[in-house]
UniProtKB/Swiss-Prot annotation:
Family: Belongs to the methyltransferase superfamily. RNA methyltransferase RsmG family.
Compartment annotation: Cytoplasm
Free-text function comment from the UniProt entry: Specifically methylates the N7 position of a guanine in 16S rRNA.
A Pfam family hit: GidB
EC code(s) of this entry: 2.1.1.-
One GO term describing the cellular component: cytosol
PANTHER family named among the record's database cross-references: S-ADENOSYL-L-METHIONINE-DEPENDENT METHYLTRANSFERASES SUPERFAMILY PROTEIN
Listed name of the protein: Ribosomal RNA small subunit methyltransferase G
Sequence positions that bind S-adenosyl-L-methionine: G78, F83, A129, E130, R148
Species this chain originates from: Clostridium tetani (strain Massachusetts / E88)
Keywords (A to Z) from UniProt: Cytoplasm, Methyltransferase, rRNA processing, S-adenosyl-L-methionine, Transferase
Length: 239
């Protein structure tokens, strides 16, 4: 139970329940990340304490956005090793969560995690965000989309906003310096049907890590031509 207190403290800070079952799930998940990371590139962060703080607690802090608990159907775009989707699912098993990643090896890992942790109502999808967003079963079907992927806010908005129903939210998990990026991405956000609501500063317990949650509300439907075809989104970001 070495890391119980720090994880419990992080959950208390954001008003989310924590118990021994959730703790055990996080520890099993950590061990699986470390084991699979020997075979495939999941993360450069591999030490026990670093995974707990820089990955798990950082993901827990998404609940700093107080409306997040009320978002029942969630998609995690560019999930990688399952961040923040798996921690969200551990903390709120009743949420419907879809994890999307373009690398099939990562999806196989996430399938194993879902099986080992006995997670239900979760789906791990292999493919590109711009392809799934044009499918009727996914387009504008989600209460919230989250992303911790490394891309600027204009690119992330084009990947993510098409999935969100009007009245839902896009939560982008960004580093400490976002103001310039936000200024450059405002037109793209508006064009895609979004409106910047707030930027929430996040601090991680027992560390000097500081991040930001960029909260974008979906206020109108995304035009059908977005997202553009594979490659265009990143090569020519909307401005």
């Amino acid at each position: 139970m070495k890391y119980y207190d720090i994880l419990n403290s992080a959950c208390n800070d954001v008003g989310i329940g924590f118990d021994e079952n959730k703790y055990n799930a996080f520890i099993k998940y950590k061990s699986m990340i470390q084991e699979w990371n020997k075979k495939i590139n999941l993360t450069a962060i591999t030490e026990d304490e670093d995974i707990i703080k820089k990955h798990f607690i950082d993901c827990i802090k998404i609940y700093k956005f107080d409306k997040f608990k009320k978002l029942n159907k969630i998609m995690d775009v560019g999930t990688g090793a399952g961040f923040p989707g798996i921690p969200i699912k551990i903390l709120e098993e009743e949420k419907e969560v879809i994890l999307l990643d373009s690398l099939n090896k990562r999806i196989k890992f996430l399938d194993e995690v879902s099986k080992e942790l006995k997670l239900e109502n979760i789906k791990n999808l292999h493919g590109r965000a711009e392809d799934y967003a044009q499918k009727e079963e996914f387009r504008e079907q989600f209460d919230g989309v989250v992303s911790r992927a490394v891309a600027n806010i204009s690119v992330l908005s084009e990947f993510c906003l098409p999935y969100i129903r009007v009245g839902g939210y896009f939560i982008a998990m960004k580093g400490p310096n976002v103001s310039e990026e936000i200024d450059e991405g405002k037109k793209a956000i508006e064009l895609l049907g979004g409106k910047l609501q707030e930027i929430i500063q996040v601090e991680v317990e027992e560390s000097d890590l500081k991040h930001n949650l960029v909260i974008i509300e979906k206020i109108k439907n995304t035009p059908n031509k977005y997202p553009r075809k594979a490659g265009m989104v990143t090569k020519k970001p909307l401005k």
